[in-house]
Amino acid sequence: MHQKILILDFGSQYTQLIARRVREAGVYCELHPNDVSEDFVREFAPQGIILSGGPNSVYEDETPRAPDVVFTLGVPVLGICYGMQTMAAQLGGAVESAAKREFGYAEIRARGHTQLLRDIQDRVTGEGHGMLDVWMSHGDKVTALPEGFKLMASNAATPIAGMADEARRFYGVQFHPEVTHTLQGKHILNRFVHDICGCGSDWNMPDYVEEAIGKVRSEVGSDEVILGLSGGVDSSVVAALLHRAVGDQLTCVFVDNGLLRLNEAEQVMETFAQNLGVKVIHVDATERFMRELAGVSDPEQKRKIIGREFVHVFQEEAEKLPKAKWLAQGTIYPDVIESASAKTKKAHTIKSHHNVGGLPETLHLQLLEPLRELFKDEVRELGIALGLPHDMVYRHPFPGPGLGVRILGKVKREYADLLRRADAIFIEELRASGWYEKTSQAFTVFLPVKSVGVMGDGRTYDYVVALRAVQTQDFMTAHWAELPYTLLGKVSNRIINEVRGINRVVYDVSGKPPATIEWE
């Protein structure tokens, strides 16, 4: 039985990152809504509890609160941002709107006399004060400590940036230790779960494999399952997991929608059908998708159409499998976050995802999402634990709608053909130069505009493509990859010379935020 941390979600976009950091520490955790019952908390029997951030103000009517049992159970509690504020308010302190809001980097003085922050600092001032570089995102602040608490961290804008009641092992921080911008954040969370909560490092991927297999078997029983197999990391890992769990009860449906990477269909069929022995049905639906997408330029509309047609194809294939009761998908945490929190519905929608936003009520299959609680790096670990090839598991992410969201505006077969050839050249050169492993995601975007060029003695008027490569630890934030000019030049020359119809190549130097990784 795992030692467990309970994370209560108050609606922050960062909440799932808390879970990721705790798991990285080798500690099992679960994320649940903030309004769970007292009986649930007691039955969960956590070693410690973390209260997440959130968009509300604790002094307003009807704002969320932590269940009272959180503070009477006798286990350590860490409140983050709003979690600290509701802790303060519920235990007798005061919270007010801040005259000066803090969003972004901040420097705070860490008072090292508490167990949580002792000897954790980024630097020491001439006066001997330990300082931390942290990430703030708040418009309210604690103005009076509850009884039994002492000051743990502060700066000019936020005099109470951290608080601690060491007798009860209650801690609150106004900053976000779960994001990478807080340089010592991982150290702080490790200190909480290991030293303060007393958890060991007993959660690991091999154990998770057995738990996931058991859960799938329990849920599915003797029913048959169909899975949309694209060849991407997520669907490949789902296929391997389900094949291990239910064997021939799994049928994979590979849908060629005309928006896949170069030679994708051949590679998928060879890897899974021939090498792994998985049952795979190959459906060529290119004409169908192109017909439905004709004339549509709005990105959200394209995503919805592609998602809808996938569902229709699966329904048609399911009718040929009378025992099929389940539709499996490779939905992972970042998909859910960007579509809005699936657990609480409190995070703001950024963009819809075809895995979580396009399933109609008339779908006759139940949804099975075994990767729903995992981040991308955890999915890759799971794939390795399941015995999948390294190159397959560490392939860059590919969006569910495929090239449909990498062709800006209207989707045409001509555009898709040009894009997949240009993209193949980019990826080939990244691999040859050793940069593929140094980037987290790289791809080419087709711009439906033409520019003037010169080739030989003639004038050209052809299309433009943009190269995009980013580096990230969690896909929540990302930096553009500083690829060598010589590499970019070689890719550009090859694309322009080898892909007739493209005469200009540009490179995207936008980070996330403010841009998203994909263009649409």
From Swiss-Prot:
Keywords: ATP-binding, Glutamine amidotransferase, GMP biosynthesis, Ligase, Nucleotide-binding, Purine biosynthesis. It is an enzyme of class 6 (ligase). It comes from Thiobacillus denitrificans (strain ATCC 25259 / T1). Residues 4-202 form the Glutamine amidotransferase type-1 domain. The keyword Transit peptide does not apply. Homodimer. Residues 203-395 form the GMPS ATP-PPase domain. It catalyses: XMP + L-glutamine + ATP + H2O = GMP + L-glutamate + AMP + diphosphate + 2 H(+). Coiled coil: none annotated. This is GMP synthase [glutamine-hydrolyzing]. InterPro entries: Class_I_gatase-like (IPR029062), GATASE (IPR017926), GMP_synth_C (IPR001674), GMP_synth_GATase (IPR004739), GMP_synthase (IPR022955), GMPS_ATP_PPase_dom (IPR025777), NAD/GMP_synthase (IPR022310), Rossmann-like_a/b/a_fold (IPR014729).
